[in-house]
């Protein structure tokens, strides 16, 4: 095991031991001792293709040997042009231009800045506010963090963050209507209420994840929700930014999660699975009607990043989207996702499990102290952390989240295995997760 301060690495956690990963194959990660871990969440919702796909590695190497780097202010490149065309072809509606960056946070930051620049260049400088869902998450750069409904992540930086008015998320399990009624949060009317409260003339954009990520444990809004959001944004001239960094690139069984809803946003971000995790890459989709305003005004998006439009990263993305298409992985994700959700139903009988939900190969398991009242455990119980540790002891990797119930309390874990997961591996995920849950009840 490796830990701080014995290593020169400043780890993501300075209080835990890390196994040293040395090899990956399919849905499995192997450490230096030879132990295999079933990667039930693709690292961080990233490893869509599975580990060890030679075609992606070879595409990266070939491009690095041919042309490793050019700056986006001076040149374009074949991989950037080809990948942008492929992504535009797959994107919903008129999102026909793509700006490449290297992380989801950067893509969100660029989208928010573009929204503001668009209104200024359109002569509507009063539009400067961004609205977002809570709970919700959009990244760790300061503007993206400001838009995130994750109080714990903001604790040390509150003085640096901008004020972002909050809209209650369509979080059916935590809503009094349980997703079946006409409450403003679940219908989308809460967005209109928030816009009117702030003043439509001041609201530039609304940002949200089409299917909930880790913040709400894969919550799926009702079928009419995003059409209602589109209607509201059109009525009040608000740009709708769809954050598909997590839910996009096929994770829900379609390339964009919004395909399930038939709604088209004004801007859309993607990341994580766009390269299957082989290199860092993210994308901001922009329609011509917005890009034209900049082209006829200042002439550029006022957002710079040294590695934007990087040819090697774009080559990896191009190889990934072609691999997904050639191997039918969207259809496979949908099919295996249906199986996963069928198999997860057994967890509902466990005394700690309050809800199981999701879409495609994205699933959330919410843990509660009392099923009838949906009361969460107190944060002091560290239930999520203990479950993650128990799962690792069983050789299963899952993703944790806390605080979603009321801003402080709440426990859930999410699953997002690679699209190449087999039915036998799905069974193994369920078996190991149940064993980890049993460790908690036995310990208690």
PLM-predicted stretches and their roles:
Residues 1-444:
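Conserved N-terminal phosphate-binding loop of PLP-dependent enzymes in the Aspartate aminotransferase
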């Amino acid at each position: 095991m490796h830990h701080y301060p014995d290593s020169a690495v400043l780890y993501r956690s300075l209080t835990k031991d890390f196994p040293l990963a040395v090899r990956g194959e399919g849905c499995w990660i192997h450490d230096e001792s030879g132990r295999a871990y079933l990667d039930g969440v693709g690292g961080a919702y990233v490893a869509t293709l599975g580990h060890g796909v030679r075609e992606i590695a070879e595409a990266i190497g070939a491009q690095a040997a041919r042309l490793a780097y050019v700056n986006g202010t001076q040149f374009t490149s074949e991989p950037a042009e080809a990948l942008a065309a492929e992504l535009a072809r797959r994107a919903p509606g008129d999102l026909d231009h793509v700006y490449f960056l290297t992380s989801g946070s950067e893509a969100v930051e660029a989208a928010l800045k573009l929204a503001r620049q668009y209104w200024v260049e359109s002569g509507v400088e009063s539009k400067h506010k961004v609205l977002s869902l809570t709970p919700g998450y959009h990244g760790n750069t300061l503007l993206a963090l400001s838009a995130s409904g994750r109080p714990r992540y903001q604790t040390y930086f509150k003085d640096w963050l901008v004020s972002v008015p909050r809209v209650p998320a369509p979080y059916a399990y935590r809503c009094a209507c349980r997703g079946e009624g006409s409450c403003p949060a679940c219908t989308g009317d809460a967005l209109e209420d928030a816009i009117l409260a702030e003043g439509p003339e001041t609201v530039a954009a609304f940002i949200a994840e089409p299917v909930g990520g880790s913040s709400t444990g894969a919550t799926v809004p009702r079928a009419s929700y995003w059409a209602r959001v589109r209607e509201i944004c059109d009525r009040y001239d608000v740009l709708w930014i769809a954050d598909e960094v997590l839910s996009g690139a096929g994770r829900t069984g379609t390339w964009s999660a919004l395909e399930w809803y038939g709604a088209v946003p004004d801007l859309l971000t993607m990341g994580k699975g766009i390269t299957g995790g082989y290199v860092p890459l993210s994308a901001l989709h922009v329609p011509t009607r917005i890009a034209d305003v900049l082209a006829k005004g200042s002439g550029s998006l006022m957002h710079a990043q040294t590695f934007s439009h990087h040819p090697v990263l774009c080559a990896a993305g191009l190889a990934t989207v072609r691999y997904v298409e050639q191997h039918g992985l969207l259809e496979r994700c949908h099919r295996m996702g249906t199986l996963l959700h069928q198999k997860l139903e057994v967890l509902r009988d466990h005394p700690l499990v309050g809800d199981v939900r999701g879409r495609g190969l994205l699933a959330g398991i919410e843990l509660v102290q009392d099923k009838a009242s949906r009361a969460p455990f107190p944060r002091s119980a560290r239930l999520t952390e203990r479950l993650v540790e128990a799962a690792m002891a069983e050789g299963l990797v899952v993703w944790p989240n806390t605080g979603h119930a009321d801003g402080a309390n709440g426990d859930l874990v999410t699953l997002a295995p690679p699209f190449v997961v087999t039915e036998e591996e799905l069974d193994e995920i369920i078996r190991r997760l149940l064993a980890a849950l049993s460790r908690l009840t036995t310990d208690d």
